[in-house]
Amino acid sequence: DGLSWHYIQQPVDEGVPGGDINFDWFGQTLKKKVWHTTVDNVSYDVAVDIKRKYIYSTNWGGGLTRFNYENGSKQWEPVPLPMDDQDSLICGEIDEEEYYFNPIDPPDGSYNHKPFSVYAVADTIWVGTAGGINKGIFRSDGCINWTHYNMEKGLGGDWVIGIIPQQFDEYTRLWLISWISPNAPHPLTYTNDGGQTWKVVNQLFNQGIIVYNLSFSRDYILASTDHGVYFSDINDGIFWMKMPITSDQTGEKILTENIYSAISIGNAEEIIMLGTADGLSLISSDRVTLDNIRFWEPASLFSAYPNPFFINHEGYNQVGNDGYVRFLYSNPNYFSGLIDIFDFAMDRVIQLNNPQSINNYESEIIWNGRNESGDKVANGVYFCRLSLKNQYYWTKLAVIN
């Protein structure tokens, strides 16, 4: 019910870091490389096998692990996956001399031993790795028979960072966020028949778009991307359009196109909740922004965010070819504010007079880092003066170009 939570330590192998350990897998003894660093052993995803009472974790360099949550000891155990050159891995038939669970890059190790995503349902488990996706069928004793798929078997990319089921009346479509390489445009992949055949969707890839997540509203498939939110008819998934996002009712904007998640909430009136690099945004069913929610300390009369301002930082407070900085100031009486920005020689760079009220107590003015001639300003410290009801307030802003 979410009212209480239990904590379990991160999966960590016993043994010498960089060395090898042996582990038992249903009567067979297999070899595994040891990882101890928390960075390489980070957990990216979890799944619950309710029928057999296991929780699975994908741990990058630490591999795929699981524990039985009804067992008092709650000890993590490694779960072997096929090596890169293996199409399958069958219980009781693993070559103990040849098999090596090793997440080092080839030729010494296997990309398929670096898991990112996991999804479990009924008697099947899917595990996405840097080397494709693995479909596992549970045996009655808890062992798993694996089939390994990669680009040679029809995927759009081998780096599977997300596995998202879409339910239809007669079947389940399984979507894969199938990257080709980190932070690069890529296709999407799906199967309607449990992996017998795969369909690659290339439109977003051809437009140079990176997809971070997929989700579903009543009528649409939603793709959260580095170019905003794209949507496709719930029964399609081939043709995609960009969702226009307006300023909210106060005029405040989301200053990024990096959308990492989109969740449909509400019953009578559907609302899409967007997780972005610039806060949480609520979008109505007719695509009007209702509110933008952020967490920051109340403005101390006058401040700038972010500071320092990386004017060309990709993905952060970037829209189009411009970066943006917010000037926040306390304004409970809704006075109209004016900001003058001066360089280190105290020459005025630009005057800003476009305030927006962001709540009952604060207002903001947004600047794109350009001077009155439209040129991006140079590196340096800038002095910013707020004029509010015949009073002056000062703050400093560091700009890194």
Where do the model's predicted regions map?
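Surface-exposed loop and turn segments in beta-propeller and other repeat-based domains
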Residues: S4-T37, W76-G109, W146-G156, Q203-N206, ...
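Glycine-centered coil/turn sites that cap beta-strands in beta-rich domains
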Residues: E297-D340
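Blade-level signature of beta-propeller repeat domains, shared across WD40, Kelch, NHL, RCC1
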Residues: E257-F302
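Conserved beta-propeller blade signature
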Residues: Y54-S57, T124-V127, N134, R173-L176, ...
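Conserved Ser/Thr-centered positions that define the repeating blades of beta-propeller domains
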Residues: D1, R66-F67, G136, S140, ...
